[in-house]
């Protein structure tokens, strides 16, 4: 039998699996950052990678995984709530997940793309038509209109 399994207290024939991690977001982000560090340290040189091993101190501090997904304010609030002695663990985790979910929710405005395309075409079309058929008073003057009778008798 594998050492990762443990026997149940009630039934000696019943095998109980080990518990999963309670923090899947932190584990996933830790693995992602660890993979990035490992990829940065890859080298084709004969000497090997730049660093012999990646430093975990940058990834974990006081058993809290620093992630890009958790905002600093939310993280500070989580740490503050976890150190205080008020409330049940279930309520605490519910508050954490609720705040993370609210922080990451996005409202996407629905847009009618057919209407936007039609209005864009309509504006373009009318701009094309109005630019061709405009009346420019200065450009349409005729030379004959400028002719002035210079033989006017001023003494009369």
From Swiss-Prot:
Modified residues (Phosphoserine): 21
Protein name: Uncharacterized protein YPL071C
Compartment(s) of residence: Cytoplasm; Nucleus
Source organism per UniProt: Saccharomyces cerevisiae (strain ATCC 204508 / S288c)
Keyword Secreted tagged: no
Location, primary (coarse class): cytoplasm
This protein's record includes keyword ATP-binding: no
Region feature (Disordered): 1-27
Composition skew (Polar residues), residue ranges: 1-12
Keywords assigned: Cytoplasm, Nucleus, Phosphoprotein
Transmembrane segments: none
GO cellular component: cytoplasm; nucleus
């Amino acid at each position: 039998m594998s050492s990762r399994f443990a026997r149940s207290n009630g039934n000696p024939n019943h095998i109980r699996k080990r518990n999963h991690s309670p923090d899947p977001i932190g584990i996933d982000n830790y693995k992602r950052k660890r993979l990035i560090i490992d990829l940065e340290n890859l080298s084709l040189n004969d000497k090997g990678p730049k660093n012999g091993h990646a430093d975990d101190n940058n990834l974990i501090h006081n058993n809290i995984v620093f992630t890009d997904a958790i905002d600093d304010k939310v993280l500070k609030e989580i740490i503050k709530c976890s150190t205080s002695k008020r409330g049940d663990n279930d309520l605490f985790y519910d508050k954490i997940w609720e705040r993370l979910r609210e922080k990451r929710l996005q409202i996407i405005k629905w847009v009618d793309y057919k209407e936007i395309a039609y209005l864009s075409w309509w504006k373009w079309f009318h701009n094309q038509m109005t630019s061709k058929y405009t009346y420019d008073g200065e450009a349409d003057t005729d030379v004959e209109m400028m002719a002035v009778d210079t033989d006017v008798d001023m003494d009369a």
